[in-house]
Amino acid sequence: WGIYIMKSYQLTIPSNIYAGKSSIDNLVNIITKENVKSILVFTDKGVRAVGLCDKVEEICKTVQYRIIDDLTAEPAVADVERVINEVGSTKYDLIIGVGGGSVMDASKLASIILGADYSLRDLLKDSSIAKKQIKTVMIPTTCGTGSEATCNAIVAIPEQESKQGIVNNCMIPDYVILDVNMIAKLPPKIIAATGVDALAHVVECFTSKKATILSDTYAKEGACKIFHNIRKAYNNADDLEAKAEMMLGAFYGGVAITGSGTTAVHALSYPLGGKYHIAHGVSNAILFAYVMEFNKDGCKDRLAMLCDAVYPELAVKSIDEKADYIIKEIADIVKDTNIPTSL
């Protein structure tokens, strides 16, 4: 760790984090604390259909609120622009995102575009001009994207058959609520896809050349939680402890992204998903083990360090054996959770 001591680092994370069963009740206090009079809620029809937005709507009834629930699964530039135009000049004091990565990304984009003198297309050219316009609360309903912790938002660009990230620290949410009740009934298929996405976050962040002692701390702890709990959460719908660990692991992965960024898996995943319209977690899963194997010689020391953190019982193994073990575990997790491994 000596190399870290001689460098300086910055890590920006959400300033208010509520975690644990029924932590969504804290939304009442947030609304009061921020003196909120009007709220814009982003979600999707699936989340509303299964009742995951009911509690949020009940709490929001104490003030004026509007719900946007017709976002596409992988929002394109035109989708986000449509929503921004629909909202128009209406003033909101708070934006709440209730859903997976796409919903939260759209929420974060709205928080920096509504009321601003620049557009989404301006941000695609230069995201450094962004400024927070409206405070945000992120309430994830999956255990994988980590969007509730990041300064990133991804939009699809169909004409280029790709996706692009907008990155600016002003998009980091002001409040995060990690309530396991929100993922208690999450289908195994979604646990698998979003969980492997979270696993890619922590592994890529830890092996990134931009890794720091701060991002490492979150990436290692996130890796421990995800490697040890993703199969449990996938196989046992009643294992709320495993799901809570997955939710926290995904959040840690998001924090790690802010500190070091992802690497080749995600870089290849965006055009794959953009061209073939594959869910983000699935496109990562298709590539994950193969990319890590291809790059192993350049990051095997870091993979071995990660293995030491996640599987301390393998401490006597060689660096190569530890690196191989992590890569094999990645492949086995994808197989064990029945994620497609080809187009």
Locate predicted features.
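Carboxylate- and glycine-rich phosphate/diphosphate-binding segment that chelates Mg2+/Mn2+
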Residues: 152-260
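Short glycine/serine/threonine-rich phosphate/pyrophosphate-binding segments
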Residues: 24-27, 49-52, 77, 102-107, ...
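Glycine-rich phosphate/pyrophosphate-binding beta-alpha loops
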Residues: 144, 251-284
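Glycine/threonine-rich beta-strand-loop-alpha-helix active-site module
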Residues: 78-85, 89-181
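Gly/Pro-rich interdomain helix-loop hinge
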Residues: 275-342
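Short, Lys/Arg-enriched N-terminal segments with co-localized hydrophobic residues
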Residues: 1-5
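ATP/NTP phosphate-donor binding region
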Residues: 6-94, 343
